[in-house]
């Protein structure tokens, strides 16, 4: 009869569990991507490995400069720190799925009323607890942590590629500047010699004073351009010193060495935009953030439902009084505790709404990131095509 009297109570607790379920928004967001590029593809567009594209330039100095810049880059250091933070969060989320085990020990001495004498009591034990995660709150939190770790790793790759691109662009700019400086200095030297000869001819009466004056002005103008070009090259070199941490004399010595011509085909672009975008770490990170935000919504929804926790303990105690020692061993399984949210002033509902809003934001940012990536690739293709046309015209 006693068991029957408790049956309605258990039914009242179990039936709500059956009706509870979580519905998270989709972890992947459909984004319209063009079927093909509008700009022409270089070399008919075949896919190659872009992990270390700078090694394909056959420029040992550039590889050294990029490695040095990546070693001292604060952006890469921050990306590594974010990976460490994301990995720590992932470990914590995994731990929430496992039982917890704590050790306890105590000792006391005092008067025992039952024994009517002073007693020393010592005890030690293990306390275990495990949340059964009925509705997947902890599993969803782990999924979100996994996705954010993947996104943090993608941002680390993006930081590396960004530093490599910046160093490559700066190095190319310096070499172009130095080549222009040589042209400007030769031009200044040539015009200076022309001015000197014009002055000699003027003194001999073979050249009009106006012609000699024009030659002097031309020489002064060429000298000013050469000086301006040297200043620009010095600024470019100092910027590269700041990027790489190299000593300036060493950098200038290495830059003065001859450079092998870069291959015509450095890398190519796939004909399908979706495959190209899949290589971009920033797009991948935005995609992973959408998946993480979806898991956050599921976790927030699950927090509104009942929670079931199983506890247990095992221990040993010793009581010593009047020269007599008594040993006691204990163990328990339970209680099996069910916690049912009844009223929280709307806190859990607000947390769910906030998680949904963050998901909507992440989805919007992902779509914007895809559009931006398509635009950047299109612009880069246009620049590549223009550069190829100018190179053909210069030959």
Where are these predicted regions, by residue range?
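Membrane-embedded beta-strand positions in outer-membrane beta-barrel channels/transporters
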Residues: 66, 123-127, 171, 273, ...
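Amphipathic alpha-helical coiled-coil segments
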Residues: 78-93, 159, 165-195, 200, ...
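A short glycine-centered flexible hinge/capping loop motif at secondary-structure junctions
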Residues: 202-206
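Terminal intrinsically disordered/low-complexity segments used for targeting and assembly
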Residues: 2-71, 146, 230-278, 320
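Small/polar (Gly/Ser/Thr/Ala-rich) solvent-exposed segments
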Residues: 97-119, 129-160, 178, 284, ...
